[in-house]
């Protein structure tokens, strides 16, 4: 019996961490945390030819970025081959598994006959009860003695009761290859059992593996965990999510300026809901998440929803957290004077962290050039003269409200309107016709810097 609720995430390090994988990890993490249990990380790196140290590092980095803390040390399957061999031997000694000496040519011949007869390709069990002399020159595989009739039945936490007919889904499948390396289904069962995994939340692409794993659990005398098979994430066109739908690598989202809080909030809702609520902090989710309420049907990736959530978190997260995330992207906000004011200036309109970075640079650094389209659209002889007069009379405003009052008084005296002056000021100060509130930009820069930038712009325009 499992002493403590324990979940795991077990990726193969053959590529980057896909957002579907991150959702699986998140579901396992939340369920463990809700129940005061353990959340384990296991790297399934038995495929020594395809494994990548960079991929392993990227998976761990993605966890760190998202704030998903696993319990204990990371388990690497590549360090457990001796353990797997012990359990292969155990099954052989107990007569629950056997050596199969079928050659590659014999296997191909069998499959050709089955295809010709329009039968499902399957191993015919010829070495299941073999007691003769093994053929020479053949390195055998090890096969499990699987049920040949009846049903494999289990209660899935998402899909309900699932039934597989033994004859439809399995033959005596291989648990150890001819070179002695164990197969995927075998290592998963050994590790989940020995690591005390009580609940397995994973994609429903693993559903067909489950009956084979149950056969192994029973053969080894291990307790079968509770399974939850989650439907895949689809693109907005209804097809399985892929790169053509946008970014799929978790760390690409970081580089795009997406906050981890937004990404996790977005992913948890792709398959799970709590009433009509849309926004959940990680702490909220640790209390609310229940895998028994995961939707049975596939979820649809909605880029606009992710953008909306990212905008929300940019507006609402504490200054120190935004500053930390910006620094992680190579932008140190703290080097600027009035950094908190600058962030508040920019975060209201920002959809990504790059909007803050680009906005900060455009305000803090005097423009080296000016958006020519904006100049053509908003600047003319009349408002250049108005801009010159504005700079000449600008003396003592300090706050945004001061600048607003000063500007309104100035425009009233000149019998002009704000639309005649606002865009030329924006262009002069930032090089662009797009910026936060012009009065707050004026406050941030201060009178001297504003006058300096306006004078420089007028000089460039020949004034």
Curated annotation (Swiss-Prot):
Localization: Cytoplasm
CDD domains recorded: GluRS_core
Signal peptide coordinates: none
Keyword annotations: Aminoacyl-tRNA synthetase, ATP-binding, Cytoplasm, Ligase, Nucleotide-binding, Protein biosynthesis
Enzyme class: ligase
Motif position, 'KMSKS' region: 240-244
EC number: 6.1.1.17
GO aspect biological process, one term: glutamyl-tRNA aminoacylation
Any GO MF annotation of the entry: tRNA binding
The keyword Ligase is annotated on this UniProt entry: yes
CC annotations in GO: cytosol
Binding site for ATP: 243
Record function comment: Catalyzes the attachment of glutamate to tRNA(Glu) in a two-step reaction: glutamate is first activated by ATP to form Glu-AMP and then transferred to the acceptor end of tRNA(Glu).
Assembly notes: Monomer.
The protein's name: Glutamate--tRNA ligase 1
Species: Campylobacter jejuni subsp. doylei (strain ATCC BAA-1458 / RM4099 / 269.97)
């Amino acid at each position: 019996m499992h002493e403590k609720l324990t979940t795991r995430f077990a990726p193969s390090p053959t590529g980057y961490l896909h957002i579907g994988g991150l959702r699986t990890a998140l579901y396992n993490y939340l369920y463990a945390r809700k129940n005061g249990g353990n959340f384990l990380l296991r790297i399934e790196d038995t495929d020594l030819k395809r494994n990548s140290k960079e991929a392993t590092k990227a998976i761990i980095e993605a966890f760190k970025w998202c704030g998903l803390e696993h319990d204990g040390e990371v388990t690497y399957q590549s360090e457990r081959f001796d353990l797997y061999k012990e359990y292969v031997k155990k099954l052989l000694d107990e007569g629950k598994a056997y050596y199969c000496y079928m050659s590659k040519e014999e296997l191909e011949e069998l499959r050709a006959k089955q295809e010709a007869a329009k039968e499902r390709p399957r191993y015919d069990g010829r070495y299941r009860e073999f007691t003769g002399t093994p053929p020479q020159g053949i390195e055998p595989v090890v096969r499990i003695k699987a049920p040949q009739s009846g049903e494999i039945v289990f209660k899935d936490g998402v899909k309900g009761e699932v039934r597989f007919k033994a004859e439809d889904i399995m033959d005596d499948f291989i648990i150890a290859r001819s070179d002695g390396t164990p197969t995927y289904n075998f290592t998963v069962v050994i590790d989940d059992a020995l690591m005390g995994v009580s609940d397995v939340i994973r994609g429903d692409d693993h559903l067909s593996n489950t009956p084979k794993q149950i056969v192994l659990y029973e053969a080894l005398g291990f307790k079968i965990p509770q399974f939850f098979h989650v439907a895949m994430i689809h693109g907005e066109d209804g097809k399985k999510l892929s790169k053509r739908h946008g970014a799929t690598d978790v760390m690409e989202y970081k580089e795009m300026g997406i906050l981890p809080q937004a990404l996790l909030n977005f992913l948890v809702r792709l398959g799970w809901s709590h009433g009509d609520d849309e926004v959940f902090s990680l702490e909220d989710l640790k209390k609310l998440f229940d895998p028994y309420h995961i939707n049975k049907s596939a979820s649809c990736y909605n880029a606009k929803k992710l953008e909306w959530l990212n905008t929300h978190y940019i507006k609402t997260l504490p200054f120190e957290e935004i500053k930390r995330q910006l620094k992680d992207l190579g932008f140190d906000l703290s080097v600027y004077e009035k950094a908190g004011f600058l962030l508040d200036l920019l975060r209201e309109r920002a959809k990504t962290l790059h909007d803050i970075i680009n906005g900060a640079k455009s305000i803090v650094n005097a423009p080296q050039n000016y958006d020519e389209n904006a100049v053509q659209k908003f600047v003319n002889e009349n408002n250049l003269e108005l801009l010159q007069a504005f700079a000449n009379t600008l003396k003592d405003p300090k706050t945004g409200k001061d600048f607003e009052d000063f500007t309104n008084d100035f425009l009233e005296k000149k019998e002009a309107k704000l639309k005649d002056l606002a865009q030329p000021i924006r262009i002069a100060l930032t090089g662009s016709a797009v910026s936060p509130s012009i009065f707050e930009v004026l406050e941030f820069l201060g009178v001297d810097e504003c006058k300096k930038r306006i004078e420089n712009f007028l000089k460039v325009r020949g004034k």
